[in-house]
């Protein structure tokens, strides 16, 4: 793919400011141009940062990477056209790979949407309100089994947009916004589910070949130069097949077939909230305690299967509290993984969290430095170990788990397709059933990488 450098420079907003500087002296022009440039850059960067901050998971990481690339290209362009061209040529593959994210950032940078920010703002006040309306229209179309612009509300919306803009809108764009926002808001509800990288899948089963151990290189003497032994011994590794799969998760709601469209439209935010919360609860619960039967196998189950269930001195009756030293002992069970602090996360029950608050080693989020990476739902740190709280541990009792330490890089969250809405007509009950479905799972590459702590037996 060939990149048009001039077009890219234009999209990056690198035009001149001549029209704004007419009637000024040379010194004034220079000063005013610098002020306007800085002001413009600050506004543009704020808009792009806002777009990145609203994204979650893998989308956010790709947007962050694209944002750094855009900043780099900006800097190179300011220095010289030749340097800019050389940078584009060197990073052509990266630019092509992130082209969708770059387009989104540049659109946000200019304050535009696919129907024009001015139109969205004129009709709904803000872009966020506009997208809320778009989401309702798409969900309503699923409920009514009509096209996005075939419902009464959809027709009125299309008419209003057409009167305000010459841009032709498509239902596909609206459905994309709907799907992205549903996933975004669902992921915001997750704590444990937000810890792991997502693995996009296009089929029910994905097979991956991996090498468990890297093997060792060979030290060779200088005297072996020119012989076969100068390249060292062959590194022999046994490849292992890993099969990734997903489980279907569905949340259901009902609406009677006599309900009018206006009434349904008013209830859509409530319907949406209920379905999202139902999905979040099920994912969090399964990722902690799932048994692998029709649902993901949870972290506590995996720790038990690995014989990595450590009995601690902490007692369920509260006579011996959970302490930082208690948690530190669990890391020993992780072996070499326990040394990689930046890749570990501690998940604790609510009771264990309140115990740790009394520990002198506890750092709440206000004490964690701004340069530290904070996880979604993070409440603090223990010995530098990030801590999140889950309410889906077993009830507090003798021998019950209260904490789990997980090596994040060993786990992945397979996802097949996006969130979908399905409808089922139940004629005998005179109602329609609506399902919000997605296919996800929690899997790991290799055994181990997780350890749980339990209260004492008595």
From Swiss-Prot:
Variant or mutagenesis effect after changing residue 45 to P: Confers resistance to Pycsar-mediated defense
Entry keyword annotation includes Coiled coil: yes
Disulfide partners: none
Recorded coiled-coil stretches: 21-110
Cleavable signal peptide: none
UniProt keyword list: Capsid protein, Coiled coil, Late protein, T=13 icosahedral capsid protein, Viral capsid assembly, Viral release from host cell, Virion
Domain of life: Viruses
Pfam families cross-referenced by the UniProt entry: Phage_capsid (PF05065)
GO cellular component annotations of the record: T=13 icosahedral viral capsid; viral capsid; viral scaffold
Effect seen on changing residue 183 to T: Confers resistance to Pycsar-mediated defense
Substitution effect: residue 328 to P: Confers resistance to Pycsar-mediated defense, reduced fitness compared to wild-type phage
Annotated GO biological process: symbiont-mediated evasion of host immune response
Residues flagged as site, Cleavage: 159-160
InterPro entries according to UniProt: Phage_capsid, Phage_capsid-like_C
Family that this chain belongs to: Belongs to the HK97 phage major capsid protein family.
NCBIfam families: major_cap_HK97
Protein's recorded name: Major capsid protein
Source species of the chain: Escherichia phage T5 (Enterobacteria phage T5)
């Amino acid at each position: 793919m060939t990149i048009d450098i001039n077009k890219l420079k234009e999209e990056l907003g690198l035009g001149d400011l001549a029209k704004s500087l007419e009637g000024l002296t040379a010194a004034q022009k220079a000063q005013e141009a610098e002020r306007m440039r800085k002001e413009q850059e600050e506004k543009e960067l704020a808009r792009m940062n806002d777009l990145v901050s609203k994204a979650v998971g893998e989308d956010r990481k790709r947007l962050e990477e694209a944002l750094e690339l855009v900043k780099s290209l900006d800097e190179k362009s300011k220095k010289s056209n030749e340097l800019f061209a050389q940078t584009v040529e060197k990073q052509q593959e990266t630019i092509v790979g992130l082209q969708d994210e770059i387009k989104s950032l540049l659109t946000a940078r200019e304050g535009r949407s696919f129907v024009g920010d001015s139109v969205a703002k004129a009709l709904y006040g803000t872009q966020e309100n506009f997208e809320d309306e778009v989401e309702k229209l798409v969900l309503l179309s699923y409920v009514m089994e009509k096209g996005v612009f075939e419902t009464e509300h959809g027709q009125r919306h299309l008419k209003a947009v057409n009167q305000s803009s010459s841009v032709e809108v498509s239902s596909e764009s609206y459905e994309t916004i709907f799907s992205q926002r549903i996933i975004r808001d669902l992921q915001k509800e997750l704590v444990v589910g937000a810890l792991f990288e997502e693995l996009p899948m296009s089929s029910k089963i994905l097979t991956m070949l991996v090498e468990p151990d890297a093997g060792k290189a060979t030290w060779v003497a200088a005297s072996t130069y020119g012989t076969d032994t100068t390249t060292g011994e062959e590194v022999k590794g046994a490849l292992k097949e890993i099969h990734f799969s997903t489980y279907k998760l569905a949340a259901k709601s009902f609406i009677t077939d006599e309900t009018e469209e206006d009434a349904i439209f008013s209830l859509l935010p409530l319907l949406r909230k209920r379905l999202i919360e139902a999905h979040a609860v099920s994912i969090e619960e399964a990722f902690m305690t799932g048994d692998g039967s029709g649902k993901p196998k949870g972290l506590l189950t995996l720790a038990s299967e690995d014989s990595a269930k450590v009995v601690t001195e902490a007692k369920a009756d509260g006579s011996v509290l959970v302490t930082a030293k208690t948690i530190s002992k669990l890391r020993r069970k992780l072996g070499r993984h326990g040394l990689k602090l930046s890749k570990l996360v501690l998940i604790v029950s609510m009771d264990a969290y309140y115990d740790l608050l009394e520990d002198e080693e506890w750092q709440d989020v206000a004490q964690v430095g701004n340069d530290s990476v904070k996880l979604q739902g993070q409440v603090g740190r223990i010995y530098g170990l990030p801590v999140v709280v889950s309410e889906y541990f077993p009830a507090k009792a003798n021998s019950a788990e209260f904490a789990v330490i997980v090596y994040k890089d060993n786990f992945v969250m397979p996802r097949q397709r996006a969130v979908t809405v399905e409808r089922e007509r139940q004629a005998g009950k005179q109602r329609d059933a609506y399902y919000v479905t997605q296919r996800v799972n929690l899997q790991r590459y290799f055994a181990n990488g997780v350890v749980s702590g339990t209260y004492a037996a008595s």
